[in-house]
Curated annotation (Swiss-Prot):
EC number of the protein: 2.7.1.148
Keyword ATP-binding applies: yes
Protein name stated in the entry: 4-diphosphocytidyl-2-C-methyl-D-erythritol kinase
Parts of the chain that traverse the membrane: none
Species in which this protein is naturally found: Aliivibrio fischeri (strain ATCC 700601 / ES114) (Vibrio fischeri)
Positions contributing to ATP binding: 96-106
Length: 288
C-alpha cells in the first residue's frame, strides 16, 4: 500500500454527437456517440490507510454517503479485490451535477484507478472498466482514458481522435435526469447506424436535443444564445450545452458575453484524459 497523499483529476466529457439507433427489449437504448474529455475537472485528494473504512469529506448536499458514486466505487473495489485497506477521500467539486458532462461517472472512475494504484491491486483497466459499468454506463470511458466512439449501450469502445477544439459551456439552472429523457414518448429512437468515418465527416447532431429543448425552456434559451455565435449542441441528455471554437481567443470573446445570470465555463478538448497522465507521473515517482 502507498500511504502518500495524492491528488487526482476527475475530468468532464462531452458527447460531440449522440444518435439513438433503437431500443432493446430490456429497455436499454442502442447508441452511437463520440466522447471527448475536456480540461474541466473535479479533483480528489486520496490518502490510503489501514482502517478498512472509506471516508469522504466534505459531504455533498443532498447526497447520502452510501449513494455517492465515489463511496460506491471504493467499496466495490474493496469487495472485488477482498482488500482490507481503507482510504480517506477529499472532494473538490466544480463539475455541475445533472449536467450531462459525466461528473459522477468520472469521480467513480478516478477512485477505481487511483485506489487500484494506491492499494497496489494491479488490476487491469479492463477489469476496472467491468466494475465501473456496474456504477454507470459512462464509467469505462473515464477508466480507459481515451476519446472514443461508442456503440451498443455505450460499452463498445473504439479509440478516436476528434479535433481538440475550444469550448464554451453553459449550465442552465436545471438538473435533468437521464431516465426522463430516454423514456420520453417523442424521443427519436430510429436513427440509422452509420460507419464511424461517415459520422465524423457529417454535421454533428444530438438526438436528445429536440426533446430536451421542448421540455426545458432554460436549455432552449441558453442553446439558442450560443447558436448566435458558433455551432452548438446539447451534451448527453443535458443540461449542459456547448459551443465549439478553433481558438482560445474566440472562446474567450464569446464567454465574456455570457449573461450575468448564466453559469459558464471555458474548456479545451482533450483526447487523452489528464487522469492517465497523473497515474503515469505517480508510477514514475513511486517507480512502479
Amino acid at each position: 500500500m502507498i500511504t502518500k497523499t495524492t491528488r487526482w483529476p476527475s475530468p468532464a466529457k462531452l458527447n460531440l454527437f449522440l444518435y439513438i439507433n433503437g431500443q432493446q427489449e430490456n429497455g436499454y437504448h442502442e447508441l452511437q456517440t463520440l466522447f471527448q474529455f475536456i480540461d474541466l475537472c473535479d479533483h480528489l485528494t486520496i490518502t490510503a490507510n489501514q482502517s478498512g473504512q472509506i471516508t469522504l469529506a466534505p459531504d455533498i448536499p443532498g447526497v447520502k454517503t452510501e449513494d455517492n458514486l465515489i463511496w460506491k466505487a471504493a467499496t466495490l473495489l474493496q469487495q472485488h479485490s477482498q482488500c482490507e485497506f481503507g482510504a480517506h477521500i477529499e472532494i473538490e467539486k466544480i463539475l455541475p451535477m445533472g449536467g450531462g458532462i459525466g461528473g459522477g461517472s468520472s469521480n467513480a472512475a478516478t477512485v477505481l484507478v487511483a485506489l487500484n494504484f494506491l492499494w497496489q491491486l494491479n488490476l487491469s483497466n479492463d477489469t476496472l472498466a467491468a466494475l465501473g459499468v456496474k456504477l454507470g454506463a459512462d464509467v469505462p470511458i473515464f477508466v480507459h482514458g481515451f476519446a472514443a466512439f461508442a456503440e451498443g449501450i455505450g460499452e463498445k469502445l473504439q479509440p478516436a481522435t476528434p479535433k481538440e477544439l475550444w469550448y464554451v459551456l453553459i449550465k442552465p439552472e436545471v438538473s435533468i435526469a437521464t431516465v426522463d429523457v430516454f423514456t420520453h414518448p417523442n424521443l427519436v429512437r430510429n436513427t440509422p447506424k452509420q460507419p464511424l468515418n461517415a459520422l465524423l465527416e457529417a454535421t454533428y447532431v444530438n438526438d436528445c436535443e429536440k426533446i430536451v429543448r421542448s421540455v426545458y425552456p432554460e436549455v432552449d434559451y441558453q442553446l439558442s444564445w450560443l447558436l448566435e455565435y458558433a455551432p452548438s449542441r446539447l451534451t448527453g441528455t443535458g443540461a449542459c450545452v456547448f459551443a465549439e471554437f478553433n481558438s482560445e481567443k474566440e472562446a474567450q470573446d464569446v464567454y465574456s458575453l455570457i449573461p450575468d445570470n448564466a453559469t459558464g465555463f471555458i474548456a479545451r478538448g482533450m483526447n487523452t484524459s489528464p487522469l492517465n497522465r497523473t497515474l503515469e507521473e505517480y508510477k514514475s515517482l513511486c517507480k512502479i
